[in-house]
């Protein structure tokens, strides 16, 4: 790497790295470092009246206070931080004091990984700490971390720019302790859900992510190509149709937690790659599934937070079951004043126009109703609410309502103004299913690129017979947002999808060389901030000369400095 691409701190750290090796200390040792304790456990288990406990810990050095022959550092491991007391004579018991005077005080930097062996004690200030007897270098960091300072529980100099945090999540996790807590809770959400399903006897399964037909949801898929089979394949938008095939095959209850992919927009609640859970249970209906779902979410919230109440933004959301139930058409009537019951497509289109909605000719009856609900109703449901009994046109995989043939036995759970769950009494009539698929194809021909494609193999599976079944899907990322009180999906994804990083435009060395500039001086000029030839056009030659000669001296490049007249000659050659 060109030294001009490095900061001053990075150069110092690389020099320290080389000096460690020259001393015979490998800064990246291969051997296992055995630990027997974590910071939080040491603090929780400490007792003043017991024999000092011997411990071996490892982690990042996050702060250091050197006071001559004694020092304090703060060590951060995977669970938290603990103070370590280090003295020269303890870690250097013989005549050679290099480990303290040279390695610890000068060659180690904040962010380096070290191992500490010693015993636990309480300082005169009352802080539980480790008295170090041995220090081991485990990994040298050559790029400095942003150091967040804490005083009286308040953080200063925080690493908080959202784009930087999401792009460099590894730094975010290293310096912002509260971020790690979000992902620990995310893991608890998953384990609590699995525990709930497994306790009922339902089996976790895996179904294909690469599919020949993108089915199970109304969404735009990612498309790829399988070279060996010379055929298009689709990244999974839902696992529904494969899971139902397993119910046909004889499993009574199956679920899958896995990645889905939708080639659509990104915003505060959508990422093109997301995690979804879908579960299907034979011999159940959507009424049973509503009760099953609310009990599951109540359990998860208790397991993760110790309470059923969570603060999300300005709202306190209570996940204690049971939840309110409202039919979709009743909700629309309540929030718009229009009763859509019995209306045909043209009548609903007129309602949309009266409501000043933006609609187009590709939208069928179901899409129009969905747009009305989304614009006027969805955002009003803050507390958990089941929206039930969706119109038939909106739900091609759902069983017809037992008491109204225009509706289906479907519900969505709304929380904090957004959909969280989607569930049905599953359609198991193969003839009806084929007709619904054919209706979807008509919508596709009208231009609806989210309409479902006919999956003939799935229809064939239904022809062999599928028992009455209820299914439910839940967005795990949105569930985690709610359980951790986060307002954006990016906060609960380790590595959210990002736009490409902006790269500073630079002219090629050849363009600078056309002005008579030596190739060796091009990176120096660009280091000074003149990335394009045109950047030098209006610059005073003396200033440019001073800038580049200063860099030559600072970085000890030992290049022969040009004269001011030579620099002026470069600038004079720049064309208008």
Curated annotation (Swiss-Prot):
InterPro entries tied to this protein: Aa-tRNA-synt_II, aa-tRNA-synth_II, aa-tRNA-synth_II/BPL/LPL, Lys-tRNA-ligase_II, Lys-tRNA-ligase_II_N, Lys-tRNA-synth_II_C, NA-bd_OB-fold, NA-bd_OB_tRNA
Residue numbers binding Mg(2+) 1: 412, 419
Record-linked SUPFAM superfamilies: Class II aaRS and biotin synthetases, Nucleic acid-binding proteins
Cofactor-binding details, from the entry: Binds 3 Mg(2+) ions per subunit.
Source species, domain of life: Bacteria
GO cellular component, one term: cytosol
Compartments, record wording: Cytoplasm
Reactions catalysed, as given in the entry: tRNA(Lys) + L-lysine + ATP = L-lysyl-tRNA(Lys) + AMP + diphosphate
E.C. number: 6.1.1.6
Essential cofactor(s): Mg(2+)
UniProt keyword list: Aminoacyl-tRNA synthetase, ATP-binding, Cytoplasm, Ligase, Magnesium, Metal-binding, Nucleotide-binding, Protein biosynthesis
GO molecular function terms listed in the Swiss-Prot or TrEMBL record: ATP binding; lysine-tRNA ligase activity; magnesium ion binding; tRNA binding
Top EC class of this enzyme: ligase
Gene Ontology biological process terms in this record: lysyl-tRNA aminoacylation
Binding-site residues for Mg(2+) 2, renumbered to this chain: 419
Pfam family, one: tRNA-synt_2
Cited NCBIfam families: lysS_bact, PRK00484.1
Family: Belongs to the class-II aminoacyl-tRNA synthetase family.
Known partners and oligomeric status: Homodimer.
Official protein name in the record: Lysine--tRNA ligase
Organism: Phocaeicola vulgatus (strain ATCC 8482 / DSM 1447 / JCM 5826 / CCUG 4940 / NBRC 14291 / NCTC 11154) (Bacteroides vulgatus)
């Amino acid at each position: 790497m060109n030294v001009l691409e490095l900061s001053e701190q990075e150069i110092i750290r690389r020099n320290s790295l080389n000096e460690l090796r020259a001393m015979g200390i490998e800064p990246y040792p291969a051997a296992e470092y055995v630990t027997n304790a974590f910071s939080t456990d040491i603090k929780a288990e400490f007792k003043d009246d017991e024999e000092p406990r011997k411990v071996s810990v490892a982690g990042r050095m996050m702060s250091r206070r050197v006071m001559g022959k004694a020092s304090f550092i703060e060590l951060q491991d995977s669970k938290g931080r603990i103070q370590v007391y280090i003295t020269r004579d303890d870690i250097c018991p013989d005549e050679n004091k290099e480990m303290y005077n040279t390695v610890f005080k000068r060659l180690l930097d904040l962010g380096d990984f070290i191992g500490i062996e010693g015993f636990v004690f309480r300082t005169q200030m009352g802080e539980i700490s480790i008295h170090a007897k041995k220090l081991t270098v485990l990994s040298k960091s050559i790029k400095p971390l942003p150091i967040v300072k804490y005083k009286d529980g308040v953080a200063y100099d925080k690493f908080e720019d959202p784009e930087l945090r999401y792009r460099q999540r590894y730094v975010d996790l290293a310096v912002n302790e509260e971020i790690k807590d979000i992902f620990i809770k995310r893991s608890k959400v998953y384990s609590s859900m699995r525990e709930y399903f497994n306790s009922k006897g339902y089996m976790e399964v895996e179904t294909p992510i690469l599919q020949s037909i993108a089915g199970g949801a109304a969404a735009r898929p990612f498309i790829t190509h399988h070279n060996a089979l010379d055929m298009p394949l689709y990244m999974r938008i839902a696992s529904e149709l494969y899971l139902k095939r397993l119910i046909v095959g004889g499993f009574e209850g199956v679920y899958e937690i896995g990645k889905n992919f939708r080639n659509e927009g990104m915003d505060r609640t959508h990422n093109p790659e997301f995690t979804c859970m879908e579960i299907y249970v034979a011999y159940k209906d959507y009424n049973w599934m509503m009760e099953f779902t609310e009990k599951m979410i109540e359990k998860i919230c208790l397991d993760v937070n110790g309470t059923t109440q969570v603060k999300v933004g300005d709202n306190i959301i209570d996940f204690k079951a049971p939840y309110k139930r409202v039919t979709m058409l009743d909700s629309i009537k309540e929030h718009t004043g229009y009763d859509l019951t019995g209306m045909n497509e043209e009548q609903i289109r007129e309602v949309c126009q009266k409501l000043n909605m933006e609609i187009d000719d590709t939208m069928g009856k179901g899409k129009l109703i969905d747009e009305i609900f989304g614009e006027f109703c969805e955002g009003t449901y803050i507390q958990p609410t089941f929206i039930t009994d969706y119109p038939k046109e909106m739900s091609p995989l759902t069983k017809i309502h037992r008491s109204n043939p225009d509706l289906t036995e479907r519900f969505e759970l709304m929380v904090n103004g957004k959909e969280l769950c989607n569930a049905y009494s599953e359609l198991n009539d193969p003839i009806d299913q084929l007709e619904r698929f054919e209706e979807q194809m008509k919508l596709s021909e009208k231009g609806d690129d989210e309409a479902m494609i006919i999956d003939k193999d799935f229809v064939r599976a239904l022809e062999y017979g599928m028992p009455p079944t209820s299914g439910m899907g839940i967005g795990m990322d949105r569930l985690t947002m709610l359980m951790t009180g986060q307002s954006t999906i990016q906060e609960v994804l380790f590595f959210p999808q990002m736009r490409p990083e902006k790269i500073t435009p630079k002219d090629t060395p050849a363009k600078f060389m056309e002005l008579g500039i030596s190739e060796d001086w091009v990176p120096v000029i660009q280091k000074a901030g003149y990335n394009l030839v045109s950047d030098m056009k209006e610059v005073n030659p003396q200033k440019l000369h001073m800038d580049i000669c200063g860099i030559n001296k600072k970085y000890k490049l030992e290049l022969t400095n040009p004269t001011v007249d030579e620099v002026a000659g470069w600038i004079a050659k720049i064309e208008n």
